[in-house]
Amino acid sequence: MAEVEETLKRLQSQKGVQGIIVVNTEGIPIKSTMDNPTTTQYANLMHNFILKARSTVREIDPQNDLTFLRIRSKKNEIMVAPDKDYFLIVIQNPTE
């Protein structure tokens, strides 16, 4: 667990990072650097989005899988690294 904490600290120290959320495969936040309402909102919305993106990738090619997802808007950028047991979600300001 110390390794996970170290990784989260390293990510959080990067310029522009607004928050980090670790979500289990059911969409339940395990760890977060954001407040509860924001964490819940991102966890719920991104969980559904990640599952749909993963399904789309597999539908195009059943031998393939989603390895990284990046969404960029005017206000922020959301990066997701899915794993078999959890999803790592990083929200950052793309202009910083």
UniProtKB/Swiss-Prot annotation:
One of its GO terms (biological process) is visual behavior. It comes from the Eukaryota. Its main location: cytoplasm. It is found in: Cytoplasm, Cytoskeleton. The modification N-acetylalanine is found at A2. Pfam families: Robl_LC7 (PF03259). GO terms for molecular function: identical protein binding. GO terms for cellular component: centrosome; cytoplasm; cytoplasmic dynein complex; dynein complex; microtubule. Homodimer. The cytoplasmic dynein 1 complex consists of two catalytic heavy chains (HCs) and a number of non-catalytic subunits presented by intermediate chains (ICs), light intermediate chains (LICs) and light chains (LCs); the composition seems to vary in respect to the IC, LIC and LC composition. The heavy chain homodimer serves as a scaffold for the probable homodimeric assembly of the respective non-catalytic subunits. The ICs and LICs bind directly to the HC dimer and the LCs assemble on the IC dimer. Interacts with DYNLRB2. Interacts with DYNC1I1 and DYNC1I2. Acts as one of several non-catalytic accessory components of the cytoplasmic dynein 1 complex that are thought to be involved in linking dynein to cargos and to adapter proteins that regulate dynein function. Cytoplasmic dynein 1 acts as a motor for the intracellular retrograde motility of vesicles and organelles along microtubules. Belongs to the GAMAD family. PANTHER family: DYNEIN LIGHT CHAIN ROADBLOCK. This is Dynein light chain roadblock-type 1. It comes from Mus musculus (Mouse).
